């Protein structure tokens, strides 16, 4: 099963996100929501409870007006996701790679992404 944000062909490469669910587990999907052309939420039943997958395509750093909308949307979703769910945040957050790591965060993320993670409980 493929869930796609469905952006028009003439803007392809600027923003779009997709999540692919193998057919053997597609019957486990509780629901999915296309929040916008950069964020898809998919909730699935697992043996240990529910898993919410947030597939994202972040804004390139330096585009502050779009960055604000992107992170506001992500924060809104995280506020309403069931607090007992496991959360998997996947995708391309388009951060510029640096050499400085951030405590409790895997990888050398872009500045906006690192700041966001420091301000939220996602680690």
Residue ranges of each PLM-predicted region?
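A shared catalytic/ligand-binding motif for oxyanion handling
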Residues: 1-123
